[in-house]
Amino acid sequence: EQPQLITVNNYDENGFRETLLKITTHTGTHIDPPAHIYNGKATLDSLPPEQFIGKALVIDCRSIKPGGHITLQHITAYGAKAKAADFLLFNLGWDKYWGTETYLGQYPCLNDEAINFILEGSYKGIGFDVMGIDPIDDENLTLHKKLFKNKQIVNIENLKNLDLCGSGLFLFSCFPLKIAN
């Protein structure tokens, strides 16, 4: 669903301009908390601010073919930097397909070894330049369920321009709007 912009006040009638923005919680770049999948788990507004800031590392996965997998080797190739990061951001190069049918297609996803490594670590979040962590045809949301079942972690989707972040650790923040539930 496309965002809607509705003028609620204007200069001529009210002396100022104000716009109502109507969007779903999955519009553009967004964050999934555990409550996205599990009732009673942490919502974005219940997580502490420090959940949304820390050291990030971009994992270059642009060589993976459509329908392929992000493997443990993609992560461990970064050595100590991968373990020192609070956020692992996966650059699949998929943001270039935004607005096309390809974007909604067979984007690469984490394999079991890679997600297990993430779950065994102390990461605050993971992020991707694709629309989800599950394959497009996985209606069961298997990876979402595995990620959020026993871990307080966030999943950031539809990131853009990860290639501009460099190859080292950098300060990253992804503070959401503080809206209840």
Task: Cite the ranges covered by each PLM segment.
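Active-/binding-site microenvironments in catalytic and ligand-binding cores
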Residues: 1-181
